[in-house]
C-alpha cells in the first residue's frame, strides 16, 4: 500500500529544512513513502535556478540559493509552506500535472473561505484579482518531487517589494488576511490536507500525521 506522512512542523529555519529535504530522498526511496510537510519559515529570500543574484543579504534578510525551478521569492512567518516529497514515478504524475494539482489544492482551499482564485497558463501559481497569493517551485530528483508551494496567509508582504517575485517585475502580491476578516488557521490546515488527499488521489493511502522530522 502507498504511504504518505503529513508533517506539521511549525516555524523552521529554511536552511535546516532544505538540508533535510536533500538527504530525505534516500530515506524515502528505501521505504517507499511519500511526504507532505506543512510549515513556516523565518524570513529568507530563496533563489531558484533561473536567478544569478549574487548578494548574500537583502536588508539583513539572508538570500539562499536553491535547486528548485523558478526565480527569487520571499518566505516569512505567516506564510504557509507546503513541501511535496512525492514518488511521482510510482504515482504516475508528470511534472505539468503535478503543478496543476498543486494549483487546484490551493484554489479549492481558498474557495472554502469564499475567495475566488485562479491559475494562469505558463505562470505557475495561484492568483486573486490579478495579484499572486501562492507561488510554486519544484525540482524532480531520482523520481521524487522536491520543494512545493508558498501560500500567503497573514504575513509582512513588504520584503517582496525589494525583488521581482518569480522573476516578474509586474507581479503584485496579496494574502488571505487582505481578503477576509477572520482566518481560522486550524480550518486552513484541514482544508489543505483534505485537498492534498483529494487532488493527489491519496484517500486510499496509509496516512500518518507527525509533528517532527529526522533523517532515518
Curated annotation (Swiss-Prot):
Predominant place of localization: cytoplasm
Reactions mediated catalytically: octanoyl-[ACP] + L-lysyl-[protein] = N(6)-octanoyl-L-lysyl-[protein] + holo-[ACP] + H(+)
Keyword set includes Cytoplasm: yes
Site (Lowers pKa of active site Cys): residue numbering on this chain: 132
Any one annotated GO CC term: cytoplasm
Gene3D superfamilies per the UniProt record, alphabetical: Bira Bifunctional Protein, Domain 2 (3.30.930.10)
A biological process from GO: protein modification process
Keywords on record: Acyltransferase, Cytoplasm, Transferase
Residues annotated as domain BPL/LPL catalytic: 30-204
GO MF entries: lipoyl(octanoyl) transferase activity
A Pfam family recorded for this sequence: LplA-B_cat
Subcellular location: Cytoplasm
EC number: 2.3.1.181
Cross-referenced PROSITE patterns: BPL_LPL_CATALYTIC, LIPB
Broad class of enzyme this protein falls into: transferase
Biological or metabolic pathway of the protein: Protein modification; protein lipoylation via endogenous pathway; protein N(6)-(lipoyl)lysine from octanoyl-[acyl-carrier-protein]: step 1/2
Binding-site residues for substrate, renumbered to this chain: 68-75, 135-137, 148-150
Active site: 166 (acyl-thioester intermediate)
Keyword Nucleus part of the UniProt annotation: no
Further comment: In the reaction, the free carboxyl group of octanoic acid is attached via an amide linkage to the epsilon-amino group of a specific lysine residue of lipoyl domains of lipoate-dependent enzymes.
NCBIfam families: lipB (TIGR00214)
Its job: Catalyzes the transfer of endogenously produced octanoic acid from octanoyl-acyl-carrier-protein onto the lipoyl domains of lipoate-dependent enzymes. Lipoyl-ACP can also act as a substrate although octanoyl-ACP is likely to be the physiological substrate.
Family as reported in the entry's similarity comment: Belongs to the LipB family.
Protein name, as recorded: Octanoyltransferase
Amino acid at each position: 500500500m502507498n504511504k504518505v506522512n503529513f508533517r506539521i512542523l511549525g516555524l523552521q529555519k529554511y536552511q535546516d529544512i532544505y538540508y533535510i529535504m536533500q538527504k530525505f530522498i534516500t530515506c524515502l526511496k528505501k521505504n517507499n513513502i511519500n511526504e507532505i510537510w506543512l510549515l513556516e519559515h523565518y524570513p529568507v529570500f530563496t533563489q531558484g535556478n533561473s536567478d544569478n543574484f549574487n548578494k548574500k543579504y537583502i536588508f539583513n534578510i539572508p538570500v539562499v540559493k536553491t535547486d528548485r525551478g523558478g526565480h527569487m521569492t520571499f518566505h516569512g512567518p505567516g506564510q504557509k509552506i507546503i513541501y511535496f516529497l512525492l514518488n511521482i514515478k510510482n504515482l504516475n504524475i508528470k511534472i505539468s500535472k503535478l503543478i496543476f494539482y498543486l494549483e487546484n489544492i490551493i484554489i479549492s482551499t481558498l474557495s472554502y473561505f469564499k475567495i475566488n482564485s485562479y491559475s494562469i497558463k505558463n505562470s505557475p501559481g495561484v492568483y486573486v484579482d490579478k495579484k499572486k497569493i501562492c507561488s510554486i517551485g519544484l525540482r524532480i530528483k531520482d523520481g521524487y518531487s522536491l520543494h512545493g508551494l508558498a501560500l500567503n496567509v497573514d504575513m509582512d508582504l513588504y520584503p517582496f517589494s525589494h525583488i521581482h517575485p518569480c522573476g516578474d517585475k509586474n507581479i503584485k502580491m496579496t494574502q488571505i488576511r487582505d481578503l477576509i476578516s477572520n482566518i481560522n488557521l486550524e480550518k486552513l490546515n484541514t482544508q489543505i490536507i483534505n485537498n492534498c488527499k483529494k487532488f493527489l488521489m491519496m484517500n486510499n493511502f496509509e496516512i500518518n500525521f507527525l509533528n517532527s522530522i529526522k533523517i532515518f
